Amino acid sequence: MTSSLYLSTTEARSGKSLVVLGILDLILKKTTRIAYFRPIIQDPVNGKHDNNIILVLENFRLQQTYTDSFGLYFHEAVSLASDGAIDQVLDRILAKYRHLADQVDFILCEGSDYLGEESAFEFDLNTTIAKMLNCPILLLGNAMGNTIADSLQPIDMALNSYDQESCQVVGVIINRVQPELATEIQAQLEQRYGDRPMVLGTIPQDIMLKSLRLREIVSGLNAQVLSGADLLDNLVYHHLVVAMHIAHALHWLHEKNTLIITPGDRGDIILGVMQAHRSLNYPSIAGILLTADYHPEPAIMKLIEGLPDAPPLLLTSTHTHETSARLETLHPALSPTDNYKIRHSIALFQQQIDGEKLLNYLKTIRSKGITPKLFLYNLVQAATAAQRHIVLPEGEEIRILKAAASLINHGIVRLTLLGNIEAIEQTVKINHIDLDLSKVRLINPKTSPDRERYAETYYQLRKHKGVTLAMARDILTDISYFGTMMVHLGEADGMVSGSVNTTQHTVRPALQIIKTQPGFSLVSSVFFMCLEDRVLVYGDCAVNPDPNAEQLAEIALTSAATAKNFGIEPRVALLSYSSGSSGQGADVEKVRQATAIAKEREPDLALEGPIQYDAAVDSTVAAQKMPGSAVAGKATVFIFPDLNTGNNTYKAVQRETKAIAIGPILQGLNKPVNDLSRGCLVEDIINTVVITALQVK
């Protein structure tokens, strides 16, 4: 499984690029199979690519393209979210993230830039993305120009929000700290968060990293280079507007790497500053920026051009004060070619941050489970790769047709629809369903030439039960029996039905024709409960009204196998109204016996029972009621003692938590047949078809 980290910040210009460079350099010492991903990037200005993506791709020579390296533009995310289509934002991000993550050992995600006015939206979006991707978070704060309290307040608020969303945070770094405040801020971090398993660190404000190079000023101000083009890498630590007499101006010239800003017609200042630059009694300057589009006199230019060590001379068309104001709006960006700044950034990160401690936290993080978005994405990808053939008997139902449209248009499965073909075509046309019926096999069981062959097969299977061939012909006009026979004979890989028919109408033909797998005494069911931050398995909530201890044990083991097959680590809780040995009575004794049977059959499986629901999901309750249990507090598979309890519980959880419930998914059959709820939505049908495709052996 790919290791990951999500770098998130609390405000703009926190110096994320330094931390990105430091982390990737750290990880590269462990593995070369790394990737870098930005879920959201700023809209391109004049066609320019995102600077941080180019910086990373070129500096670390990663084997990924620019377009692979980001999800979507900020304006796209805002527009879709405003239209209530946040799921489209997340789906696009997830697809591109998985494309990279599936090829590497580690992926670093860098959050958005907070350059607009939607900072609250950005924070929530970054939190949602990190949670969806199951990425631990490294939180980066910005102390530039802030007091200690102002630097720590956004960190407190962010951590509180992450805690509420059950996000895992592996570190807090405060960047751009004034050196004189570094010790106190570090002490405050330790005092506030030292009891949490996190890396805590500060990175001091660095004058070189915060300073523009002259070439950035030339670009930002659209300035001309009059001389010194080979010195545009000079760093500008300060800038000074000079309009007074040169004798007075020199009094203010006491910082090195200063950019002098003066009108272009002030030849006295230009020459005086040039001489000061050469003098051992004054600091060297970064350059001279002339304003108001005034070119120096030709004689002055001739003099400057003859000086061997003259600083660069630049010219801009704006007046002096406007030029100075525009200069304040420019911010340095780490260029992919600025090797000195890149090396300095990495060295500063290594010096200030305990990288090995961060790596250890990343290694020891135990995921609570796969997130719903990731779970469903993985299922769809696997089903698409498998290209199974699924039969949908209720082909005239509008929800089935809408689901079929999505499945076909996205190339997830191959489909056969059963029903009156003219009725199917009419329903598609009247309801403007985007389904190309030429890509779907349509069969009317009542007129199909295959019905006679299917009837003969059914007759052979059921004649010992008194079924005649004439009866078989009549039975095979039923869509459920016809679809089930297609699966039995290998003419379809699986079947999904039940949107307008009962569970028995779906299950009975499967039991009669497909039958249970060897070693299975019954067919049972599970629901995949896609909660906000994890996916759980509930069984049996649909088929067996009151299983005995043997049957309950079988349901538990089958459900655990189903969970494992779908990427969920099985930790099985057999539920009852009491935990451990505290309760008595026939109901709890049945669960106790079922647990013993299941443990005997699979001793290596993490399994606990009887256990109450709260002890199964809540670590605090688990510590009190069942200390030391491998399941209590972290169960992923929940086995209910009877249908009444299971069905009501799954519906209550679904309603109260807005969870997506996928199922019921049938277990124990020789070939996959699955039932739908009659109240199912189009999305439920799609999910069940995907699951069915993946149950095919």
Swiss-Prot record:
The keyword ATP-binding does not apply. It holds the Pfam family PTA_PTB. Pathway: Metabolic intermediate biosynthesis; acetyl-CoA biosynthesis; acetyl-CoA from acetate: step 2/2. In the N-terminal section; belongs to the CobB/CobQ family. GO terms for cellular component: cytoplasm. The gene is pta. The N-terminal region seems to be important for proper quaternary structure. The C-terminal region contains the substrate-binding site. Involved in acetate metabolism. Residues 374-697 are annotated as: Phosphate acetyltransferase. Its EC number is 2.3.1.8. This is Phosphate acetyltransferase. GO terms for biological process: acetyl-CoA biosynthetic process.
